[in-house]
Amino acid sequence: MAVSSATASSKLILLPHASSSSSLNSTPFRSSTTNTHKLTPLSSSFLHPTTVLRRTPSSTTTPRRTFTVRAARGKFERKKPHVNIGTIGHVDHGKTTLTAALTMALAALGNSAPKKYDEIDAAPEERARGITINTATVEYETENRHYAHVDCPGHADYVKNMITGAAQMDGAILVVSGADGPMPQTKEHIILAKQVGVPNMVVFLNKQDQVDDEELLQLVEIEVRDLLSSYEFPGDDTPIVSGSALLALEALMANPAIKRGDNEWVDKIFQLMDEVDNYIPIPQRQTDLPFLLAVEDVFSITGRGTVATGRVERGTIKVGETVDLVGLRETRNTTVTGVEMFQKILDEALAGDNVGLLLRGVQKTDIQRGMVLAKPGTITPHTKFSAIVYVLKKEEGGRHSPFFAGYRPQFYMRTTDVTGKVTSIMNDKDEESTMVLPGDRVKMVVELIVPVACEQGMRFAIREGGKTVGAGVIQSIIE
């Protein structure tokens, strides 16, 4: 990794979370920071048809909600490669509408369960404002692949949750309104995608029906390509498809059996997925390494036990295997008694799968977001480490001013955010330093206030005041 040369400054923005061999990992936030989740399909499959699901209490005091969810519907057949993608972009540019159109178009081919807009945009406080606050996960299939699709929020207040979804993506669909062109959050989401290591992007120019002049659409396309290139995405080579998600969705609602060639707007949706199939490569999964899953969410099921959901970062897990529960509290051992994905039973979960794991003998109070489940003895909790950190410039969305030893930002590691103190700083010549300027690359020693499961080579983000100010990789564990 080029960390010494000044020319590589923007390269190191790719540093949040995970080992160096895996560019994408689980999500870098703990639930205490935001409590406006909705139920994902990952854990609901462990339940009997009328089971009421209760969420673990959070440190914030929001009204408790209960959910009624369906039981598992059969077994998950792994016939196609699995890819995690998602929609990102500015508020009201049509991300959730496009997600709904995608599921309905592919359902018409028999490759997905159709989801209406209001099923994806489900929480009451979201629908009331027409703004998505959380990330919602849906599944669908093309002829060649099985996709888990995260619908990311576009509202500035909820950038934190956008990263929660983005960190799981193997690729993204950037939605830009052809009528408005790139907006502030379009740029912000491209920066965030770069920071959390989303490797590939396909663009959907939405609201084509609202653009009278074809030349205006071409100008927007040029602007989007330039914007992508400015953040080191291959703007000139990025596939761009224009269409209208709303008109496609309306056509599909009127006739769910629409096939290719029946409707020009629905054909644009099929064309978009063709580009995603062709342009976003199937990632190399780390199935040969020891199992690790960062816990994103925890649910308790009466009579069954506790379910932890998250994305398998590496390795494989089967029913009956034992795992360590590591980080934030004392390490403990438990047995996996069930593995399911999208309301279907799995024999074995592989790296890259979004799964729910049923755990034996674990109370919902024993486990929280930010812990990791791992093969026994393969990872331990630590509070002090040295790291190489790149501090973002103002133009990259970072700080405007320097910081000093004693600085106490939030450190985002996998699914947890923990306050840490920068105890010492060394410059790139290994000289003791007291001040760090935006754009600097430094070595620092960090002390966390609680132990977190971390290891050499793991990446993390540093955030303060709602923005990412730095990105780093752990060089060595101190204690």
From Swiss-Prot:
Region (G3): 151-154
Region entry G1, spans: 89-96
Pfam (any one): GTP_EFTU
CDD domains: EF_Tu, EFTU_II, EFTU_III
Chloroplast found in the keyword field: yes
Biased composition range(s): Low complexity: 19-32
Residue span of region G5: 244-246
Domain of life assignment: Eukaryota
Annotated GO biological process: mitochondrial translational elongation
Keyword field contains GTP-binding: yes
Renumbered residue ranges of the record's region G2: 130-134
Residues annotated to bind GTP: 89-96, 151-155, 206-209
Region (G4): 206-209
Biological role stated in the UniProt entry: This protein promotes the GTP-dependent binding of aminoacyl-tRNA to the A-site of ribosomes during protein biosynthesis.
The protein, known as: Elongation factor Tu, chloroplastic
Organism, scientific name: Glycine max
Gene: TUFA
